[in-house]
């Protein structure tokens, strides 16, 4: 069935709110139950537009949540849990921190690092299994590496 983008996004919001959705293909399948044919790239764009993000739930699984429904969790507590579960190594190169994670978890961990609101951290960039953390200067970088390494 052909529906408007607005209606499809409303359904995606409903699906995310009612079910634990861990990947975009699950949303494609759920939309089929409503008689709506959608492909993964369309769902990916919709998720971005409606502000859906993947966060770790209470069971340690990553699921989609809407930003306005995301519970406020102490970022240091969340980082500690994420680091112990998903970080493989931390290294330093000049004023960059390179964090290697298990595949598929880097963006979630980078988002938590951004929420730490550390003045010395300029920003993060995440791929599938690698995070670059840009730090203002090498001295601050060393202190942050020590603090992050102590969490592992």
From Swiss-Prot:
Biological process per Gene Ontology, one example term: regulation of arginine metabolic process
Main subcellular location: cytoplasm
Role summary: Regulates arginine biosynthesis genes.
NCBIfam families documented for this protein: argR_whole
CC per GO annotation: cytoplasm; transcription regulator complex
Source species, domain of life: Bacteria
Record keywords: Amino-acid biosynthesis, Arginine biosynthesis, Cytoplasm, DNA-binding, Repressor, Transcription, Transcription regulation
Protein name according to UniProt: Arginine repressor
PANTHER family: ARGININE REPRESSOR
Coiled coil location: none
Pathways involved: Amino-acid biosynthesis; L-arginine biosynthesis [regulation]
MF terms (GO), sorted A to Z: arginine binding; cis-regulatory region sequence-specific DNA binding; DNA-binding transcription factor activity
Localization terms from the record: Cytoplasm
Protein family membership: Belongs to the ArgR family.
Lineage, highest ranks first: Bacteria, Thermotogati, Thermotogota, Thermotogae, Thermotogales
